[in-house]
């Protein structure tokens, strides 16, 4: 593909120093920019990625998307939040109650408890990561993907967990 006017001659942004700290085993991943998205690829599979990238194949998804560069900001991705490679304390986190977790999954606005640092915060329910919000102090912007949100108005009164045997 030919590059558009804006993209022509533009160098890839430098990799943010803190991005390596997002991964629990940073030495086993190589970081690369794919357009404005920073992706982490397992070094164990680097030969395979090189082979795939050399062919005219359309790769839908590979590695872990750590986030997106928008201007001077680096916005962490939902993939990173759900990845087992995420360092547990890489971001400030807050534990949500059932009602707030459902609000988050519906992509509704959340009000976080005071004392939480401003910036990107990992929200959890029962210690499991759900995704990121950007804490602005008086409110938090929900970064949950629009296409993944819960769209039904029905919320069960009782939580039923189905565990396999």
What role is predicted for each listed range?
Residues 1-165:
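Polybasic, low-complexity RNA-engagement segments
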